Every structure is written in C-alpha cells, then in structure tokens.
Amino acid sequence: MSWQEKINAALDARRAADALRRRYPVAQGAGRWLVADDRHYLNFSSNDYLGLSHHPQIIRAWKLSAEQFGVGSGGSGHVSGYSVAHQALEEELAEWLGYSRALLFISGFAANQAVITAMMAKEDRIVADRLSHASLLEAASLSPSPLRRFAHNDVTHLARLLASPCPGQQLVVTEGVFSMDGDSAPLEEIQQVTQQHDGWLMVDDAHGTGVIGEQGRGSCWLQKVKPELLVVTFGKGFGVSGAAVLCSNTVADYLLQFARHLIYSTSMPPAQAQALRASLAVIRSDEGDARREKLAALITRFRAGVQDLPFTLADSWSAIQPLIVGDNSRALQLAEKLRQQGCWVTAIRPPTVPAGTARLRLTLTAAHEMQDIDRLLEVLHDNG
C-alpha cells in the first residue's frame, strides 16, 4: 500500500462511518452570536463560558500591552521570552488557587503532554479515567509508563488498579469537569484513594476553572481538594487561550528542567498574559459572580425544558449540556436542521466519544439570554 492509498483508505473509512471531521470558516465564533456566510446564528458551540472573549476591559488590556511589549514574546521563556507580564500572571494565578507556583503554557494540550512526559518513567504507572481528554490519554499512551484506565468516575475500580504492585510511582489522572459529558469527577473520593496508595493526583480543570466555585476557583476548590498537579486553561472561562500548571516549588523547578513542551516552545505573547490578568480580575470580581449566577440560571432553564425530548440528557450541571443521539448520521442531520433554524450546534461523533454515543454538544454561556435558551428549546422540540 502506497502513502496515498493509506491516506485515502483512512479518509474513506471516516466518510463511510459519517465520522469525517470538517472545519467551517466563521467571521465570529465566540460570544452570543456565531457569524458565518453573512448570517448570524445563536451560538451553542463555544467554550467561552463566561462570555469574556469580547469583554472591553480584556480587549483594552491586550491592545495597550501590544503597544508596550509588541505582538510576540521573541522566544522561549528559557531564553528571552519570559517577561514581567508572564511573571505577574503566574504569581496571581498561584495566589488565587492556593499554590506555591504556576507555570504558563501555550495550550492545555501542551501543558498536559509536558507534565506527563516529564514526570513519568518506565517503572511508574499512570491510572486515568477512561473518559479523560485526548491530550491526557495520548501523553499517557506515549510515555514509557504503563497506562491503566478506570471506569468513568468509578472510585472502586480505581482503588483496585492502584492496589496492584507497582515498582515506581503512581499518577492518577482525571478531569474536574469532563469535556464531552459535562459531568464532574468525585475528586474528594479520588484523592482519598490516591493518597491511600501513596500516589499523586493530576486534575485537568479546563472546563471548571473560572466557571464554578468561589471566585471561579474551579472544581478542586469547590470539592476542597488540592491535587499535586492542577492544570487550568484559558480558552474556556477566561475567554482567551493558553494554560497553566499549578504545583509546588520543587515540582515547578523540576518542570522547568525537564518539561520539553515548555523549554522548546515560544512563550505566549506578553500582551496575552496581560489580557489574562485582566480576565482573572473580572473572574474574581462581583461581575464574575454575576456572570456565573446568570450561567447557572440559564442551565436550569435549559434542563427544565429539555426533559421530554427523545434523547438522553447527560447528568451535567455545567455549561456543557450534551444530548446523546446515538447514531452518527442522525446527530449530523439534527445539527444541520438546528443550523437551518438559526442555532449553531456541533455534532460530536466517535472517535471523540465512544461508539454509539454521537451527540449534540450544547454549550451555554453567560453571553446568552433567556430568550436564546427558549429558542433553542423550541427548535429542539420541533426536530425531536
């Protein structure tokens, strides 16, 4: 089989399964409205959960800082790319979340890959929730450590896996809020079991940080858990992009030596770091509280109105509200019908989710209004 034949076969298999991914160029993809082909759609696909991507205070911070620092960092943080703006953001994040240190990364994917790659050796073991994000599972699969997966949120299964002999260290990996199901991990129970077996806990709280908990401190703060490694991202609740790893002083020093994704990547622009500082200020303020309260009210309204639809509604009180359709073709058809009626919704299919669980991944944001939720419910009932 030639290279071209190999590529064609893989693409043909995806097409045959109605699983071929496509991108749509949009004029605006975050906020209340998605704009594509000169048409405005109510946007139920964005991860901009607090509606901060268009916040004037954050935009102003980026503009002013771009004039001060320029539009790029100029290099890796280990060379010339670590600015006073990066340092200030790291210190503010660490203070906010109760850690000694924070290290910035250009993306959540890079942060997860960097930590697992740097921390794990062949004598160690990774024990991950089966539904953990692709960045976590890929890093675990590529690391020299054996990977064991426990059934989703099943602490008993986790305990059994941790109890089996391991010559090295054990790292338990999970998410705070799961990206495709919107449900939360039982972090307190997971941490207790992990500590009983002298393991460390790593939590990716991409979808909880900024959105839940006191001052938006996220899933771990809400459940009174402090994992040894906490990954937060800035493309969801913060409305920007990037990520950070929260940890102890010694772990931060270790990652600065051995985390190749950090060492060999150009740092985020200093102006972006300043915009993230502005975003953090909003998240921690009374305005942030008001946005979280509004989002919670929108979620309650949606869940109350969707109960009688012939789809499975995931057990989620987060901004992620998946409607599980099952069949790939049916999910694609339903997403297209909703778009035709002015609601932009994304169909998520295998391999992103397990086979037979194709779904509409609906996301609600504080930028929405109650009438937007009512319109979504109306369209769903028309096509249910």
From Swiss-Prot:
It comes from Escherichia coli (strain SMS-3-5 / SECEC). SUPFAM superfamilies: PLP-dependent transferases. CDD domains: KBL_like. Pathway: Cofactor biosynthesis; biotin biosynthesis. The keyword Transferase applies. This is 8-amino-7-oxononanoate synthase. Its cofactor is pyridoxal 5'-phosphate. Pyridoxal 5'-phosphate binds at G108, F109, S179, H207, T233. Its EC number is 2.3.1.47. Pfam families: Aminotran_1_2 (PF00155). It catalyses: 6-carboxyhexanoyl-[ACP] + L-alanine + H(+) = (8S)-8-amino-7-oxononanoate + holo-[ACP] + CO2.
